Amino acid sequence: MITIFNKLKQSLSKTSNTISAGIDKIFYKRKLDKETLNELEELLISSDISISVVTHIIEEFKNVKFDKTIDSDTVKEAIAKLIEQQLSKSEIPFTLSENKLNIILVCGVNGVGKTTTIGKLSALYSAEGKKVAVAACDTFRAAAINQLSSWVHRANALLITGKASADPASVAYRAIEESIKQNIDILFIDTAGRLHNNKNLMDELSKIVKVIKKLDENAPTHSILIIDAITGQNTYNQIEYFNDVTNLTGLIVTKLDGSAKAGVLVGAVQKFNLPVYFIGIGEKIEDLKIFNRHDFSRSLVGL
């Protein structure tokens, strides 16, 4: 049986193979000196680990190991520990309130796997005995509601929809009222996939947030941005724009199994001080995993 850690290693292989092979090549019978450190710096930056994080790693190597012969496994172990330290703020649990409705706003650009992720989350919490509902606020795209309906049905959750082309904020409002009536534990609000620089769509998202707060000034419980690891450095722009509109509480990172740019997660956490609640490492429902910074850091460098 494949373990969660081994599954994670497989998912990160496109990134970790590059980093691991690069480290092996750089430190084959060589000292840790200025030349090898420059090569290591270039390797890590090319894997989309942010410059600030890479600079910190290089400085730590200078302080501890400079001008000494070192093997590649020792380098990988050291990098993994340093990356884990940089991710110290990433492992905040995805907490839910008891005996009240938890409103979870889920947003993201087109194609990041937002609807699929909501389906997986619905299945996860339904299996734990929670009453789950999903508000289909992507009202202008019929295919989105059909896709969501399939996932929600599999998760044994309640789907709340509006009429075609209905105001998304009105659907969110009705979904909250209906969820309160039915004693729902968790309501996921699925918003339209939008480009972060499309003002009209971002205004629509802002309106949904205002409607939620009319019903509960402390809501939403969580505002989650779904990002995919394939995006690379553009992830930073997405987080910045969506955070301005929704005051994000955390991230879910998808498509780690298809990306050679998984290192971007490290820089995103370090730059925005946002936790990573879950990561997607495959297409199956069970492939949405709680983020573990220790396992991620080691897998990223091929350990």
Swiss-Prot record:
It catalyses: GTP + H2O = GDP + phosphate + H(+). It is a peripheral membrane protein. SMART domains: AAA (SM00382), SRP54 (SM00962), SRP54_N (SM00963). Its EC number is 3.6.5.4. GTP binds at residues 108-115, 190-194, 254-257. It is found in: Cell inner membrane; Cytoplasm. Keywords: Cell inner membrane, Cell membrane, Cytoplasm, GTP-binding, Hydrolase, Membrane, Nucleotide-binding, Receptor. It is an enzyme of class 3 (hydrolase). One of its GO terms (biological process) is SRP-dependent cotranslational protein targeting to membrane. Pfam families: SRP54 (PF00448), SRP54_N (PF02881). One of its GO terms (cellular component) is plasma membrane. Its main location: membrane. InterPro entries: AAA+_ATPase, P-loop_NTPase, Signal_recog_particl_SRP54_hlx, SR_rcpt_FtsY, SRP/SRP_N, SRP54_GTPase_dom, SRP54_N_sf. The keyword Cytoplasm applies. Signal peptide: none annotated. One of its GO terms (molecular function) is GTPase activity. NCBIfam families: ftsY. Involved in targeting and insertion of nascent membrane proteins into the cytoplasmic membrane. Acts as a receptor for the complex formed by the signal recognition particle (SRP) and the ribosome-nascent chain (RNC). Interaction with SRP-RNC leads to the transfer of the RNC complex to the Sec translocase for insertion into the membrane, the hydrolysis of GTP by both Ffh and FtsY, and the dissociation of the SRP-FtsY complex into the individual components. Part of the signal recognition particle protein translocation system, which is composed of SRP and FtsY. SRP is a ribonucleoprotein composed of Ffh and a 4.5S RNA molecule. Belongs to the GTP-binding SRP family. FtsY subfamily. This is Signal recognition particle receptor FtsY. It comes from Rickettsia prowazekii (strain Madrid E). The lineage of its organism: Bacteria, Pseudomonadati, Pseudomonadota, Alphaproteobacteria, Rickettsiales. The gene is ftsY.
